[in-house]
A protein has these predicted regions:
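A conserved beta-strand-loop-helix scaffold within acyl/acetyltransferase catalytic domains
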Residues: 153-160, 165-166, 170-183, 188-191
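Acyl-donor-binding surface of acyltransferase catalytic domains
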Residues: 1-143
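Conserved beta-strand-loop-alpha-helix junction that forms the acyl-donor binding cleft
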Residues: 220-234, 239, 247-248
């Protein structure tokens, strides 16, 4: 038996997909006074790593661009000009039309060391939360001591956290991999022996409902090649609102 959790559409502030992508970019990175990306925005500062030199978020409503702090001003202007000339997005899964030009501009400054991208999702208005999911707190964090020892040590940083428990141990968890004032992004993991049983979808739904109940927007993203993670999004009923490309 599942219970319906979440806000009615009428309770949500008017926002298009480009606005939502902007909130996601603001949530996923830290910034300097110029609005340039510095580091990834994990709740635990020790887990943060240097931001890419370029984040391009694409939606049917328009683009969102963030440039890394290491990029010279002239390069930042060049990247933004290239993206401004892109045609409207017709297929989110297709590479950006300007990808080759962006690579060339970045490579003139420094070699490209990493490239990534994938879909970004929002949660539906009503989120069904399976009753078997357990919220992790200080009182029961022993559930992750053996299976997720890093989470046992850092539980307070990654809240809210939810788990599916088998034989007294957490076998799947969802936590806040990024956390901001307006939104949070899901991080999900299932032990290999327990994959393919719907546990990841269950904990993700519970996490999304909790973030929404806190007055923030729950978000989920993954890489195009991560078919298992995209499958979780389908099972939870998440709605793809955009896609991103990152170049470091």
């Amino acid at each position: 038996m599942c219970r319906s959790l979440g806000l009615d559409e009428g309770d949500l502030a008017p926002m298009d997909d480009r606005d939502l992508m902007g909130i996601r970019a603001d949530t996923d990175f830290t910034y300097d006074a110029r609005g340039r990306m510095l580091r990834s925005n994990e709740p635990c500062e020790e887990a943060r790593r240097p931001a890419p030199r370029l984040f391009l978020g694409r939606t049917m409503a328009g683009h969102v661009v963030r440039v890394g702090a290491s990029a010279p001003d002239a390069l930042a202007r060049r990247l933004e000009a290239i993206i401004d000339r892109q045609p409207p997005v017709g297929d989110l899964q297709a590479p950006p039309a300007a990808l080759a030009a962006l690579r060339e501009a970045l490579a003139r400054h420094a070699p490209i060391t990493a490239e990534g991208g994938g879909p970004a999702y929002r949660f539906p208005a009503s989120i069904a939360q399976p009753g078997e999911v357990v919220q992790l707190t200080d009182a029961n964090r022993a559930l992750v001591r053996e299976t997720y020892p890093w989470l046992y040590d850092e539980l307070a940083d990654w809240q809210p956290c939810f788990a599916v428990v088998r034989d007294g141990e957490a076998v799947a968890v969802c936590f806040s991999s990024r956390s901001g004032a307006d939104a949070a992004e899901a991080g999900v993991d299932t032990l290999p022996a327990f994959r393919g049983r719907g546990h990841a979808a269950a904990v993700t739904a519970a996490w999304g409902a909790a973030i929404r109940a806190s007055g923030r927007i729950p978000l989920y993203s993954t890489a195009w090649e991560n078919l298992a993670s995209r499958g979780v999004a389908r099972r939870v009923g998440l709605i793809r609102f955009g896609a991103d490309t990152t170049l470091a």
